[in-house]
Amino acid sequence: MLRRKPTRLELKLDDIEEFESIRKDLEARKKQKEDVEGVGTSDGEGAAGLSSDPKSREQMINDRIGYKPQLKSNNRTSQFGNFEF
């Protein structure tokens, strides 16, 4: 590894303003999400996320990542196709 002098980073006013605007935007989104979750808890939907049921937890994860599992049948046509001789 080569030794070199540390690179100097300068914090500019534009950078600070950009950081503040992004932080405010993220805080607004977080508040909005908390408000939506607050409404869901009164309906009982929010409690499902806290339950220890592995099926519901797995389903929540699959929904979050967009995974839709397909059930596989165990017959030969599904494994090898429909071959006719």
Swiss-Prot record:
**Keywords assigned:** Cell cycle, Cell division, Coiled coil, Mitosis, Nucleus, Phosphoprotein, Ubl conjugation pathway
**Might you name a Gene Ontology BP term for this protein?**
protein K11-linked ubiquitination
Its UniProt pathway annotation is: Protein modification; protein ubiquitination
Where in or outside the cell it occurs: the entry states: Nucleus
Q: Enumerate the residue ranges of region (Disordered).
A: 26-85
Record PTM Phosphoserine, positions in chain: 42
Where is this chain compositionally biased, Polar residues type?
71-85
Coiled-coil intervals, chain numbering: 7-37
Q: Where is the composition biased (Basic and acidic residues)?
A: 26-36
Query: Gene Ontology terms, cellular component aspect?
Result: anaphase-promoting complex
Q: Which InterPro entries match?
A: APC_suCDC26 (IPR018860)
- Describe the subunit structure: V-shaped homodimer. Interacts with CDC16. The mammalian APC/C is composed at least of 14 distinct subunits ANAPC1, ANAPC2, CDC27/APC3, ANAPC4, ANAPC5, CDC16/APC6, ANAPC7, CDC23/APC8, ANAPC10, ANAPC11, CDC26/APC12, ANAPC13, ANAPC15 and ANAPC16 that assemble into a complex of at least 19 chains with a combined molecular mass of around 1.2 MDa; APC/C interacts with FZR1 and FBXO5.
Biological role stated in the UniProt entry = Component of the anaphase promoting complex/cyclosome (APC/C), a cell cycle-regulated E3 ubiquitin ligase that controls progression through mitosis and the G1 phase of the cell cycle. The APC/C complex acts by mediating ubiquitination and subsequent degradation of target proteins: it mainly mediates the formation of 'Lys-11'-linked polyubiquitin chains and, to a lower extent, the formation of 'Lys-48'- and 'Lys-63'-linked polyubiquitin chains. The APC/C complex catalyzes assembly of branched 'Lys-11'-/'Lys-48'-linked branched ubiquitin chains on target proteins.
Family recorded in the similarity comment: Belongs to the CDC26 family.
Q: What is this protein identified as?
A: Anaphase-promoting complex subunit CDC26
* Organism, as annotated: Mus musculus
